[in-house]
Curated annotation (Swiss-Prot):
Effect of residue 74 to A: No DNA binding
Domain notes for this protein: Although this has the same function as TubR of B.cereus strain ATCC 10987 there is little sequence homology and the dimerization interface is different.
Keyword Transcription regulation carried by entry: yes
Phenotypic consequence of residue 67 to W: Dimerizes, decreased DNA binding
Record keywords: DNA-binding, Plasmid, Plasmid partition, Repressor, Transcription, Transcription regulation
DNA-binding span(s): 43-50, 54-65
Regulation: induction: Probably part of the tubR-tubZ operon.
Miscellaneous field: The pBtoxis plasmid encodes all the major endotoxin proteins (Cyt1Aa, Cry4Aa, Cry4Ba, and Cry11Aa) responsible for the mosquito larvicidal activity of strain 4Q2.
Record's protein name: DNA-binding transcriptional repressor TubR
SUBUNIT field: Homodimer. Binds to tubC DNA, the TubR-DNA complex binds to TubZ.
GO BP: plasmid partitioning
GO molecular function terms listed in the Swiss-Prot or TrEMBL record: DNA binding; identical protein binding
């Protein structure tokens, strides 16, 4: 098995696990705007968008940051988050799965 194939399988598995957790899925997808593009948000904005408790959203954002699914940028004393390249690949897996489901 070549390295790219192994990497693709791991991304698909990660996407499936996130997709099975409603909170994790909502937090990750909050970073995608209505045009399907990645957007920058702070943790409070994510919590308000998806209407989940701040502690839950903050913990999920922190875990995604530690896992490398989102990137953090300091703006003054605040931190802004956006999808990393890995996070974008996971979202692409969600989109691909949705298209497959529509074609069934």
């Amino acid at each position: 098995m070549n390295r790219d194939h192994f990497y693709t399988l791991n991304i698909a598995e990660i996407a499936e696990r996130i997709g099975n957790d409603d909170c994790a899925y909502q937090v990750l997808m909050a970073f995608i705007n209505e045009n399907g593009e990645a957007q920058m948000l702070n943790k409070t904005a994510v919590a308000e968008m998806i209407q989940l408790s701040k502690p839950t959203v903050f913990a999920t954002v922190n875990s995604f940051y530690c896992a490398g699914y989102i990137d953090e940028t300091r703006v003054g004393r605040s931190k802004i988050y956006t999808l990393s390249d890995l996070g974008v690949e996971i979202v692409e897996c969600f989109k691909q799965k949705a298209m497959e489901m529509r074609n069934l």
